């Protein structure tokens, strides 16, 4: 039952809907129901119970998916009452709920052993102690957590012991979000991947040089080989590139790495050491890393190959699709050009406020068109060389916004070449093979289209006002407008997308009869 579209549904009606599904319900999404009361939650718990109304202990439901993010009025006791009756729960999202406490983690550990996905982001009453308790319980029972996805954005008081227990208890983690954990330190990252010599699962022994330590040390360092595919450490402001060194060789399956917002503490040494061990990397976020140099881009730039089909798939950068290096002011244009030419799958490049040149942007646009990359995007805002002349030069291959055809996008008034909406300016914003170019000059095109539409609409109104009652109507004289979604009009054969221009009608929405 997906009820997120009805956040103001009365409690009586909500209970009636849930009661109709009863114990057969396996999914419940109450995201955004800010007025949901604790008494209502307790009533819903009874409705979902397999044995509700019967004197059988303990009652339980069959929920495998539960999303209560944003339910700010729910109390801790009512939430725990529901969780104690959800033994089959696999996906649990309570993002931003003040009712979530450290005790909630204990309840999850005892009553929800099948959890695969857990989102406890931005829960102000939760601290690292609760996560340590959650992980330590699994270690004590010698039963590793089944968790594949864990999101803890904004968690407070994360210690080395917390990360060590989590690393030991959750060997199957593929997605880990620790963004905005502002007291997360390098040593906690080290504790997460460190393991003893008798570690039962996959591990690797590293030399001091490989581990980013003093090469003169005589010892070796053992690291767990994790299954992580997505790691987010964005805005963990206490981290440095030393944390990257700790993670090197420990994440061979990683595809998405987010290190944005850390700033100048990210240096070349640790970042390069990590990137050289990530052959499957598809997205890299290094926003605000203003101290990195060309060495970082070179570490993810495959060597030129005359035969793209036989390109080595073990080379970092061969799978790179999305790169964010905004405000990395020390990166040279030559490094950008080499990256653009040698990363065959590069589809999104965000390089605002960098030294990227107009030539590099033109090369990206040309190669994206040749490779037929859908929805390719280049962001070059506040780049000195990207002036209005350059934008006009490549206007035939670009668009200012990533438009799409849907009723939800109607108010955004995307310019669609499939509509009979010739305004004389702008580019087709719904053509997936046009490259999205975001610059100050390209955004002016959006304003120009809006101004042209407004001017044309005013002209139509004046002509309509001057038309005599016996003459032809304005609608007959004007070209056919978009009929994709007009009140009371049957949808046409389907090629026209929504438009903000409503001829002879200033109001959007339903027509009152």
Explain the meaning of each model-derived region.
Residues 1-42, 80, 106, 132, ...:
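N-terminal adaptor-interaction module of cullin-RING ubiquitin ligase components
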Residues 9, 36, 42, 72-75, ...:
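Leucine-rich repeat
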Residues 15-30, 105-118, 166-176, 274-284, ...:
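Glycine/serine-rich loop-strand microenvironments at binding/catalytic pocket rims
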Residues 18-19, 45, 49, 83-84, ...:
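Ankyrin-repeat helical core positions
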Residues 23, 34, 58-61, 69-72, ...:
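Inter-repeat linker/turn residues at the boundaries of leucine-rich repeats
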Residues 161, 179, 186-260, 265-513:
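C-terminal capping region of solenoid repeat domains
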């Amino acid at each position: 039952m997906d009820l997120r579209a009805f956040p103001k549904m009365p409690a009586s009606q909500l209970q009636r809907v849930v009661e109709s599904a009863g114990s057969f319900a396996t999914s419940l999404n109450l995201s955004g129901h800010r007025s949901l009361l604790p008494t209502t939650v307790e009533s819903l718990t009874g409705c979902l119970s397999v044995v509700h109304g019967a004197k059988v202990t303990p009652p339980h439901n069959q929920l495998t998916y539960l999303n209560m993010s944003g339910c700010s009025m729910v109390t801790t006791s009512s939430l725990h009452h529901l969780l104690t009756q959800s033994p089959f729960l696999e996906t649990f999202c309570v993002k931003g709920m003040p009712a979530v406490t450290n005790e909630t983690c204990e309840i999850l550990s005892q009553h929800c052993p099948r959890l695969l996905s857990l989102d406890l982001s931005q829960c102000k009453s939760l601290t690292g102690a609760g996560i340590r308790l959650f992980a330590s319980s699994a270690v004590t029972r010698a039963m590793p957590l089944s968790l594949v996805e864990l999101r803890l954005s904004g968690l407070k008081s994360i210690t080395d012991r917390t990360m060590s227990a989590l690393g030991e208890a959750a060997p199957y983690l593929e997605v880990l979000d620790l963004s905005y954990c502002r007291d997360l330190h390098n040593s906690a990252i080290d504790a997460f991947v460190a393991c003893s010599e008798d570690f039962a699962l996959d591990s690797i022994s590293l030399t001091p040089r490989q581990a980013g330590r003093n090469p003169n040390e005589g010892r070796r360092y053992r690291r767990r080989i994790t299954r992580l595919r997505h790691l987010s450490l964005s805005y963990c402001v206490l981290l440095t590139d030393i944390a990257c060194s700790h993670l090197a060789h420990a994440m061979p399956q990683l595809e998405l790495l987010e290190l944005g917002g850390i700033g100048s503490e990210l240096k070349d040494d640790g970042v390069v050491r990590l990137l050289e061990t990530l052959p499957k990397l598809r997205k890299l976020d290094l926003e605000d890393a203003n101290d990195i140099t060309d060495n970082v881009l070179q570490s993810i730039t495959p060597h030129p190959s005359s035969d793209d089909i036989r390109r080595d798939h073990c080379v970092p950068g061969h799978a790179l699709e999305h790169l964010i290096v905004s405000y990395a002011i020390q990166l040279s244009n030559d490094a950008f050009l080499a990256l653009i030419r040698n990363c065959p799958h590069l589809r999104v490049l965000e390089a605002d406020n960098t030294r990227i040149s107009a030539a590099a942007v033109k090369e990206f646009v040309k190669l994206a068109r040749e490779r037929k990359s859908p929805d390719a995007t280049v962001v070059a805002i506040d780049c000195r060389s990207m002036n209005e002349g350059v934008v006009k030069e490549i206007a035939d291959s670009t668009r200012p916004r990533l438009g799409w055809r849907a009723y939800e996008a109607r108010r955004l008034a995307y310019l669609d070449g499939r509509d009979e909406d010739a305004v004389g300016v702008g580019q087709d914003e719904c053509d997936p093979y046009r490259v999205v170019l975001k610059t100050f000059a390209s955004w002016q095109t959006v304003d120009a289209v809006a101004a042209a539409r407004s001017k044309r609409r005013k002209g139509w109104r004046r002509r309509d006002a001057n038309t005599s009652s016996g003459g032809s109507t304005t609608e007959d004289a004007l070209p056919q407008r978009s009929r994709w979604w007009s009140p009371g009009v049957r949808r046409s054969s389907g090629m026209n997308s929504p438009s903000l221009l409503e001829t002879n009608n200033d109001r959007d929405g339903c027509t009152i009869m």
